Amino acid sequence: LALVEETTEESSDGIFSLKDSFKDEELSDNNESKFILTTEVEDMKRVHHLIIFPSIEAVKIIRTKLKGNMDADGRPRIRMDGKEIMEIAHEYGCIIGPAHAFTPWTSIYKTYDSIKDCYGKMPDFLELGLSADSGMADTIEELQNIPFLTNSDAHSPWPHRLGREFNELEINKLTFEDVKGAILNKHIKANYGFDPRLGKYHLTACSKCYTQYTIDDALNMKMKCPCGGRIKKGVDYRIYELSKWKTPHHPIHRPPYIHILPLAEIISIT
């Protein structure tokens, strides 16, 4: 937070840009990057939540109220459940939803079979994560009315992971309220992301040696790999467990999901 305050300034309502002293002089002002305040937090049941903030002031207030080990790493751990975190986020004008909702380690669907079991009601959005796309998620009935987001890690130490998934929103002005309104009112024009088959957690695999297994073989082995590692259910199988339909039932508001291959991946195979 101190770094954000040191290097950026609010250029419009809830939107930030670099201060002049931190700008690259070779970049045109017309191409200047803009920032919105977000964080990913881990609750007491190890479910990860994405919060999008309207202001620095809201960040400071919520930071105090969440009372967790806030400085442990880029993903604060909070001694509250999802419902409590959502109530605080909404109290201060934020929007909130589950991060990487299907991954086998720290996601809402790793811990719960229904979103309402976590929040008590539906969240503002659901982040798909790298190992799932709209076609997979729209086989789950309870997600029909929830906007999907495709985001990249902002807490990764590897710069090439920034921006590898992103969203296209229909807004009138670049302000927090317009971004919030586009998400809540389903004015997302497109999701851009990985082919989920490229995702780290797409298939059932050992968490230690990364050997992949069919779910039947994994269950017969009691989810233990011969190497001594734990076998974790893949996102594809977890969605199969949760799904009502064999094929996606896209609601009318669902935007296209456009599969992309990040530049770093293209370079690595050339």
Language-model segment annotations:
Residues 18, 22-28, 34-37, 84-92, ...:
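C-terminal functional module detector
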Residues 53-56, 105, 145-148, 249-253:
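Short, functional N-terminal and low-complexity linear motifs
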Residues 67-167, 193, 212:
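Domain-core and long-helix interface of multi-subunit machines
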Residues 54-63, 109-112, 191-193:
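Short, composition-biased local secondary-structure segments
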Residues 1-84, 128-142:
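A metal-dependent hydrolase metal-coordination microenvironment
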Residues 39, 129, 152, 172-173:
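Residues at the C-termini of beta-strands that transition into short coil/loop
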Residues 40, 53-56, 100-101, 264-268:
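Short loop/turn segments at strand-loop or loop-helix junctions that form parts
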